[in-house]
Amino acid sequence: MGNPRCMSSLFASLFLAAVMTAAGAHAAPPSGLPASAAAWRAAAAADIEVAVQVTREHHPGVHDPNNPAFLANLDAARRHGLQLAAQVEDMAGYVAAVDGFNARIGDGHAGLAVRIDKTLLPKPRWPGFVTVWRGDGLYVHPAASGAAPARARLLACDGKPAEELIRTNVFAFQGRVAEPGQWWSEARKLFVDTHNPFIPRPRRCSFTLDGRTFDQVLAWRDIDSAAERQFAASSDGDARGVGMTEPRKNLYWVAMPTFHPNEAERAAYRALNREIADGRAHYLAADAFVVDLRKNGGGNSMWARDFARALWGASRVDAALAAFSARTEVWWRASPANTDYVAWMAAELDRQGQPDGAAWARTQAEGMRAALGHGELFHVERKEPDAAAAPPAAPVPAFERPVYVVVPGDCASACLDALDVFTRFPNTVLIGAPSSADSTYMEVRRHNLASGLAAVRVPNKMYVHRGRPDRQVYQAAILVTDPVWSVDTLLKVVESDLARRQPGR
């Protein structure tokens, strides 16, 4: 599997998604649901209490020397969640209370994941238009603007300024308000009504367009299939399938909409990397490359790393990443349940015909079991020394042409890992939005609750001295503020920057 030092990150992303799918299938929610308002209140409170207890017992953050405020933050989230739970009257209220608890924790790798069948919930509603955040406000997207003028900017609703409303109606229940990228991905949900009983649905909003201010009375209606298509079209635009195109001579567009590829997409990635490696002499003279990460929900960062090795040269990428992660350690929280999970993971990988992954997982499980036997909180994953290398090949010529990376606001997980790789090189230019951020708590298992309504997110490990610090956001060098994030819009941004770089400009 290449350098053993990469084993943790490689297998974590390559295998754990499939393993987690199998693990999550072990138990399905019961058919019986709480039958009264009192029962829903009791369920919300009980599930939040159990989530806190499970987190205390198994989450690595509880004993993280670099995060002494973890438990205080968890306790504050508990108090807030229980305040909401005490007001719950139905299923939608249960979901909202859990969301409020999670938002107060502020980490997507902690808290509760609701397991209720979405078809049982009331249909979400919308006012007949879609908005997108573009750095300084919400703008009506042209893809769905029938009930409000396209490109109009929201000023306020019901006398409440737009930003204040987004904080109370959106970020109090989802997303992470301190991360700029989350505004780009989450703020638009202001105009999606999920029947949250703790927030008022906007009734009358004011907008501005071309110097004119006007009011709009909102007419809420169920989101149907046509509306869903409009939401999809407005979310980061028209992302392409995995592969490379040449929108104009000598400018190459590389689409990476997923790092969790299916069989056809895996073949497309391999073909792309072969094309870059085999034709590298030609591509050294490219005007620019554009790497498009729109729609990328993470997965296995190996695909980005392999592309980078083909483009910049394997030895350069490997050396840059080795320096970036030279101090990184991986600490596995050695609780009995975490240890059992990693041991199960090893058996599951064996069953899937992944012997290298199974061996790696088994080593971690054995280390966790040994730590338990010694009363230690963590098993620290051992870094294997580099294997004896073959004599180095002559270095390939450096790739020095501009590489523009289109970053969506919800870029996280393996998408952030890709930015870790690409930004090792000074010819990389990030365009689009600020990214999201990750905590250092990873490899999440799900602890299903007896209620069947939710599962606790339990990371099994944490990074110490990671090259990218906890909660670090990648800022775009060029913000793309047009409401429409189409390929044409993004190409205009790239061409403008290329023109600026011309001698004499």
Which stretches of residues belong to each language-model region?
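N-terminal secretory signal peptides that target proteins for export/translocation
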Residues: 1-8
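Short, conserved helix/loop micro-motifs enriched in His/Cys and acidic residues
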Residues: 391-406
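Extended, charge-rich low-complexity interaction segments
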Residues: 349-367, 459-481
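Flexible, low-complexity junctional segments that flank or bridge functional domains
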Residues: 27-343, 347, 402, 417, ...
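Short N-terminal or domain-adjacent regulatory/targeting segments
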Residues: 197, 227-229, 374-391
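Low-complexity, serine/threonine/proline-enriched polar segments
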Residues: 322-378
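Bacterial N-terminal signal peptides
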Residues: 11-22
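Extended C-terminal subregions enriched in glycine
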Residues: 350, 402-424, 429-438
